[in-house]
Every structure is written in structure tokens, then in C-alpha cells.
């Protein structure tokens, strides 16, 4: 497999916008190639080395996906804590409720685990070491943990969390796309 640079303006190239459930800041499109002709000068790297070129940055790209998810999950946690401190039920803030405290605690554990594992992967990259296995496991585990954090944040909000009045629902949808 070889890697080719084909500009969007090239004759025969067309795209169709895809409407997504989340991640609205990043457009998704289908790309169609109808009788597109490419020149040898458009090949990136050696013939047959396309897969290796793609894989070269794959470890770092996975780190970016985990970091994005971590930031979104942290925002959901911050929102849940702020809401739990201000929402009064039965005469006191809901943050005093053991169930709410448990959700916030679970979230914090998952956030810390993900953050430290990500830092470890980035440190290994800085040392010139492969993180192929580590980042594969972290992306798998981290994406599920981040989604659980957003889910827990929705639960802290109760019924309000399932509305578009607060951003934790949007965060959940965005994380679902990772």
C-alpha cells in the first residue's frame, strides 16, 4: 500500500457531509474518488510504505484521542461537582449524599488513573520507547472510563442531566464518538 496526497480540488474528488450525534466541532465527510488520476509526484514516501507511514504517528495520535477524552471527562466531573455543591435537596446540598459522593469518587479515581497512564505513555515516547501495547490498552480502557465519568455526571444532575440545558449530555455524546 502506498500513501498518496490527493487535493480536494482534484477532478473526480467529491465529499458528502455526515451528520453526527456528537463532536460537532469536527466535521465528518464521506470522500468519493471517481476516475481520479494521480501523478507519481503525489506519492508520499516510498512505494509500498504507506502503511508504515500511517503507523509511525499512530501511537502519538492515540495519545491525543485519550487526552481529548480526558479533558472532556474532567469538564463533566467539574460540572457535576459544582452542581452537587449548589443543588439543595431536603435542606442540604446533594454533595452530602453518599450516593453522589460515591459517583464523584469513582470519577476521580478513573480520571487520575487515565491521567497518570497517559503521562507515562508520553514519557515513554519522549524516551524514544514504543508505547504500542500501553496506548492500545489505555485507549480501550480510557474511552470506556471517560464515558462512564460522563454517565456518572449525568446521574449527579438527575433528570436535568438528560436535557440539553446542561453540557454533560453533550460531553457524553462527544465521548461516545471516541
What is the meaning of each model-derived region?
Residues 8-37:
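Flexible, small-/acidic-enriched active-site or ligand-binding loops
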Residues 30-35, 40-41, 48-49, 55-178:
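Alpha-helical interface subdomain recognition
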Residues 1-6:
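Glycine-rich, Trp-frequent "lid" loop and neighboring beta-strands that shape
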Residues 18-22, 44-53:
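Short intrinsically disordered coil segments
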Amino acid at each position: 500500500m502506498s500513501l498518496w496526497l490527493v487535493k480536494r480540488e482534484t477532478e473526480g474528488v467529491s465529499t458528502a457531509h455526515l451528520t453526527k450525534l456528537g463532536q460537532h466541532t469536527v466535521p465528518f465527510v464521506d470522500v468519493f474518488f471517481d476516475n481520479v488520476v494521480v501523478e507519481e509526484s503525489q506519492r508520499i514516501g516510498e512505494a509500498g510504505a504507506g502503511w508504515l507511514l500511517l503507523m509511525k504517528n499512530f501511537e502519538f495520535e492515540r495519545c491525543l484521542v485519550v487526552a481529548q477524552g480526558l479533558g472532556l471527562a474532567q469538564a463533566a466531573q467539574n460540572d457535576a461537582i459544582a452542581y452537587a455543591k449548589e443543588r439543595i435537596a431536603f435542606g442540604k446540598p446533594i454533595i452530602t449524599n453518599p450516593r453522589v459522593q460515591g459517583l464523584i469518587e469513582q470519577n476521580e479515581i478513573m480520571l487520575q488513573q487515565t491521567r497518570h497512564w497517559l503521562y507515562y505513555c508520553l514519557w515513554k515516547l519522549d524516551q524514544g520507547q514504543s508505547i504500542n501495547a500501553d496506548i492500545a490498552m489505555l485507549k480501550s480502557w480510557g474511552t470506556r472510563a471517560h464515558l462512564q465519568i460522563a454517565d456518572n455526571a449525568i446521574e449527579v444532575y438527575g433528570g436535568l442531566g438528560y436535557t440539553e440545558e446542561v453540557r454533560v449530555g453533550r460531553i457524553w455524546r462527544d465521548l461516545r464518538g471516541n
